[in-house]
Every structure is written in structure tokens, then in C-alpha cells.
Regions:
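Hydrophobic residues within the alpha-helices of tandem HEAT/HEAT-like
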Residues: 22-27, 57-68, 122-130, 163-174, ...
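Extended repeat-based solenoid scaffolds, especially LRR ectodomains
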Residues: 331-339
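Short inter-helical turns and helix N-cap capping residues of alpha-solenoid HEAT/ARM repeat scaffolds
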Residues: 10-11, 48-50, 111-112, 150-156, ...
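Amphipathic alpha-helical segments within extended alpha-helical solenoids and repeat-rich scaffolds
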Residues: 27-43, 80-110, 132-153, 180-200, ...
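Acidic, Ser/Thr-rich intrinsically disordered and amphipathic helical segments
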Residues: 2, 17-20, 35, 39, ...
Length: 339
């Protein structure tokens, strides 16, 4: 703990010494002496600690994972020199890995957005080599988080945001065929349920983030279409049509008739439409499926662009309407007037 706090010191020498110590501690000691990773994960998940200390723990933990977790990573440090002799050590012990993964999953529903974001980043790195064989609890836990919006759960907003932030990070990783199929089959329907839900709890930003996740899945599928032909065909044929139908409802041009640009939620609604247009651009590459919905969706997109012209003039030419700033947690689905 003291070393992590020292990394935040205003004194350069103190910071350098602390960072050097932590860098040394992430190097292999022995196959059994492996408590650093668990300790860092515990510090990250401890809500009573200073946010800066928790963030410092996250930075150190990510370095630890890269060097110690698995030979799967190119950065894995397998050999060390002790008294001039090169010794080979094992990766992080199984029990320690379980503790760390459990702590990181808990951090996904932390009240602090920055903790959720850093935990997601580390967990996606771990999942790229552990999921699904060594990380079977991942998808059930995420499903529980995504289902929480239907329950009277005080932490539902954190859970849903954390789960979707992780999914975004995960689908940016190069998933194999089995991983991609499992994510699509078990989580994409839940995301669609959130998007189409009539619940007042579901904010436009939450819906936009769901679309963003599936959008990234589509990008991964498109890039893998020549490698995983059957999987890509099955997933897109089964899951894409319901999403395209839902986009028609969400793109209703009536929104602009009553839009109040003094209300933050109005800008969130605009951000949702921006995310839909980006999604449709990728979905259009799957022509056999998209062509059925293309005429209606194209009319809706053109109608939206026409409706946005007055807003564009007010924001960018006359400067009569102030463009809102987004909080860090919502930067990934922030609105735009330029489309």
C-alpha cells in the first residue's frame, strides 16, 4: 500500500523509487511465492481506499498480468537470473488467478466509473487467454449483471455499465471462433432486450452502449467472415434481423419535433441516433440480410439528417446552442451534431 501511495508523491525521487520497486515485484520470484497480484486486485476492489491508490493498483496489476499471467502473452517473463543462474518459473498459480478474476468481476459493478473501466481493461486481457476453458464463470456473471436492470437492484446501473464496458473491451480483442460464438449466443439477445425495453430506467446512453457492443461484434464478424464462414453466417442470420427491426423504431423522426435542447436527455437521444447510424454502416456490409431493411432505414437516416440541419446551424454557425460536455463514463456514446 505504501509503495502505491508513493507513486503519487510530488517528489520525483520517491515516485521513481516506488515505480522501480513495483516493476521489480512484478517479475517472477518462484512458482509458489505469488501474492502480489492478489494483493493488487484486493486494493483495486476496496471502495474505502483513495481512488488514486486504487488506480495505481490497477496500473501495477495490468503490468503484473502481462508479465506473470500466462505464456499466452508475448510479454510473459518466464526466465529470471538468480546469482548469475538462469531459472525458469511458472505462470501465476491457478488459485491466485481465481482470486484475481473474482475481484475484477466485482470491480465491474463498482460505484466509481474509473475503477470499472480499469478493471474491464485488465479483465479483457485475462479473458483473451482464459475464456472459456479456465474462466467458466465469466458469461454467467455478465448475464447476471445485464439482467439486473429488470430487478430492483440499487447497483443495476453500475452492473450494466460495467458489463457492457467489458464486452466492448473484449470484442476488441481478437477472439477465436468458439469465443465469438459464445459471446453472440449468450449475450447479444440480452443486449437486444435492453435496447427494446420500455423500462424508464434504461437511459438513451445505456441503449446506445448496447448498440455499440453489438456494432463491435459485427465488425469482428465481418473481419472473420472468410475464416469462420459458418459461424458468421449463423450469427448474422439469426441475430441481425431483430436488431435492424429495432433500429427502425428507435430512428423515428418524431423525436426532432419535440426536442428540447436544454435537456441533457435530449442530447443523449441524439447520441443514440448517432450510434445507430454508425451501426447501420457496418450492418450494410452483410448485404443479403440488410437489403430487406435498407429502403426503410435509408429513408429514416435521410429524414434525420434533414431534421438536424437547423440544429447544426444553431450549434456550429450561429453558436446559439451550447454543445454539452459528456462525463468520462459516457464518452464512448457521446452525441455529435456533425454525424
Amino acid at each position: 500500500m505504501a509503495r502505491l501511495q508513493d507513486t503519487l508523491s510530488s517528489d520525483q525521487a520517491t515516485r521513481d523509487a516506488a515505480e522501480q520497486y513495483l516493476a521489480h515485484e512484478t517479475l517472477p520470484k518462484s512458482g509458489t511465492d505469488d501474492v502480489l497480484g492478489v494483493q493488487l486486485a484486493q486494493i483495486l476492489s476496496e471502495a474505502s481506499l483513495s481512488l488514486f491508490v486504487r488506480q495505481a493498483a490497477a496500473i501495477a496489476l495490468k503490468k503484473y498480468v502481462r508479465k506473470r499471467w500466462s505464456i499466452f502473452f508475448d510479454t510473459f517473463t518466464q526466465d529470471m537470473v538468480v546469482n548469475g543462474i538462469v531459472q525458469t518459473v511458472d505462470a501465476t498459480p491457478v488459485e491466485a488467478k481465481e482470486h484475481i478474476r473474482t475481484s475484477l468481476l466485482a470491480c465491474l459493478c463498482d460505484a466509481e466509473p474509473k475503477v470499472r473501466s480499469q478493471a474491464s481493461d485488465i479483465l479483457s486481457l485475462i479473458s483473451s487467454c482464459d475464456f472459456p476453458d479456465h474462466f467458466p464463470q465469466l458469461l454467467p456473471t455478465l448475464q447476471g449483471y445485464l439482467h439486473s436492470y429488470t430487478e430492483q437492484d440499487a447497483h443495476a446501473a453500475y452492473k450494466v455499465h460495467g458489463a457492457m464496458k467489458f464486452l466492448l473491451d473484449l470484442v476488441h480483442v481478437e477472439l477465436d471462433e468458439n469465443q465469438l460464438l459464445m459471446v453472440a449466443q449468450q449475450l447479444v439477445p440480452l443486449l437486444q432486450g435492453i435496447v427494446s425495453s420500455s423500462s424508464d430506467w434504461i437511459t438513451p446512453h445505456t441503449r446506445a452502449r448496447c448498440i455499440n457492443v453489438f456494432h463491435q461484434c459485427l465488425i469482428s464478424l465481418y473481419m472473420a467472415k472468410d475464416t469462420y464462414v459458418d459461424t458468421v453466417h449463423m450469427v448474422t442470420t439469426h441475430y441481425l434481423p431483430p436488431w435492424l427491426q429495432g433500429m427502425q423504431v428507435l430512428m423515428s423522426p418524431d423525436f426532432f419535433n419535440s426536442a428540447n435542447w436544454q435537456e441533457p436527455v435530449t442530447w443523449e437521444m441524439l447520441g443514440l441516433r448517432h450510434e445507430i447510424v454508425a451501426f447501420l454502416g457496418t450492418a450494410s456490409h452483410f448485404r443479403n440480410i440488410f437489403q430487406e431493411y435498407a429502403p426503410t432505414l435509408l429513408r429514416l437516416v435521410i429524414a434525420q439528417l434533414q431534421a438536424m440541419v437547423p440544429l447544426f446551424i444553431e450549434c456550429h454557425m450561429l453558436d446559439n446552442i451550447s454543445f454539452p460536455s459528456s462525463v468520462e463514463a459516457d464518452a464512448d456514446v457521446a452525441c455529435s451534431v456533425s454525424m
